[in-house]
A protein has these predicted regions:
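Short, well-ordered coil/turn segments that N-cap beta-strands
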Residues: 93-96, 120-124, 145-147, 183-186, ...
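Membrane-interface junctions of multi-pass transporters
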Residues: 303-345
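Radical SAM enzyme [4Fe-4S]-AdoMet core and its adjacent flexible, acidic
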Residues: 2-10, 147, 152-298, 302-308
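Short Fe-S-cluster ligation motifs
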Residues: 85-101, 361-383
Length: 383
């Protein structure tokens, strides 16, 4: 038994302050405490609702986007079905919900669902491409504040936007980002490197850093589920390109990466030959879930296991994916590995390189390479 574990949220906040010697925003830190407890107890406190696969952009690398013709006669879930699922999720413990798509703001009854979640007392985050964040939408969000507006930036000019998304939408998005900032709404900008964006990713990141203190750079692409042929491996940059991107961002933030010869770094892999305790190391299926536009529950957007809350009810569907998540096999070689603290432990990322429970050799090599380039700081190997 770990006697150092805080017994309540107040002790948790005190622990964070002692460790970091600074004050914390109470809700953010309290959310972290709830997250740690929820994972242990299997409570679904986070829910992501993929309202629609339809979008007003046509990004070549998007994992979910479909056109109206590609729906092939299938229809979007009506608002009442979504509300029923959301209420069941709330009853099961959800207090934070993310609305996404496609482009979630194109869903005809977006406002109805957003306000319904607010009425339940949920924090609501919105993932959007930013095109529809006009003055009217900003007034709506000021009246009913979201927990976060996350906007993906696909370029730094109309020419780049057209190449990546099929639409010259940069100036619209840029103006709308400024609207969000002026309104004082919480903002996160994301950038997704890909070979359609190419070298323009650097100016895109520079622009993102000038617009927001909070940006996220994705480091892999999702394979489209409906049309896996639409993206091939060449669309996802190689490790060397990601290293250039992440070093560039470090330098923008005043961080000087410390490179080391790769042969001075330890080989990946720990001493264990028996499998460690199973279970996903993220919150997917343990404290969070995704419900797709088809009404299927998933561990996350990138993993295949699914259940059917429309047929079986939310509680039974959650039980199914939670069982999968807590019994997910982990590679024995990861336990005690020198890179254990810095490795990307995303199970979906592991699945790109190996079957569940096996060591993902190519990912291990990539992690070692990133450490040699100074992107990852390996404990015990700092200069």
């Amino acid at each position: 038994m770990n006697t150092d574990e805080p017994k309540d949220a107040y002790e948790y906040l005190d622990m964070l302050r002692r460790q970091n010697k600074k004050e914390f925003q109470s809700f953010s830190a309290f959310s972290e405490y709830l997250e740690s407890k929820a994972r242990k107890q299997g409570v679904p406190i986070h829910g992501q609702f993929e309202l629609t696969p339809l979008c007003n952009l046509s990004c070549k690398m998007c994992y979910v986007h479909l056109s109206a013709d590609q729906l092939q006669g299938r229809s979007l879930l009506p608002a009442e079905s979504w509300k029923d699922l959301m209420h069941q999720a709330f009853e099961a413990g959800m207090f934070q919900a993310t609305l996404t798509g496609g482009e979630c703001l194109t869903y005809p009854e977006f406002d109805t669902l957003y306000l319904y979640l607010h009425s339940l007392g949920c924090q609501v985050d919105v993932l959007t491409n930013g095109i529809l964040l006009n003055e009217e939408r900003i007034r709506f969000f000021k009246a009913h504040p979201p927990g976060l507006i996350q906007i993906t930036l696909y370029g730094w000019s109309d020419d780049v936007y057209e190449r990546v998304t099929g639409r010259r939408a940069f100036h619209t998005v840029h103006e709308n980002i400024l609207r969000v900032k002026e309104a004082g709404l919480p903002l996160l900008l994301t950038v997704t490197p890909n070979m359609f964006l190419g070298e323009d990713v650097f100016e895109t990141i520079r622009l993102a850093r000038s617009l927001s203190d909070d940006i996220l750079i994705n480091t892999s692409l999702f394979v489209p589920e409906e049309e896996p042929w639409r993206m091939n491996a060449a669309d996802d940059p190689e490790a060397a390109f990601y290293a250039r991107i992440l070093r560039f961002d470090q330098e923008l933030r005043g961080i000087t990466p410390q490179e080391r010869p790769i042969d001075e770094l330890p080989l990946p892999g720990g001493p264990c030959s028996t499998c460690p305790e199973p279970g996903l190391e993220c919150g997917g299926g343990r404290s969070g879930f995704v419900i797709t536009w088809k009404g299927e529950m998933r561990i996350c957007n990138r993993m295949a296991p699914r259940s059917y809350p429309l047929r079986d009810g939310f509680a039974e569907a959650w039980k199914t994916i939670h069982h999968t998540a807590v019994n997910w096999p982990r590679p024995a070689a990861c336990s005690g590995c020198a890179y254990e603290a810095v490795c990307n432990k995303c199970a979906a990322e592991f699945l790109k390189y190996a079957v569940p429970g096996e060591k993902p050799e190519a990912l291990c090599a990539r992690t070692r390479y990133m450490a040699s380039r100074g992107i990852l700081s390996l404990p015990g190997c700092e200069s």
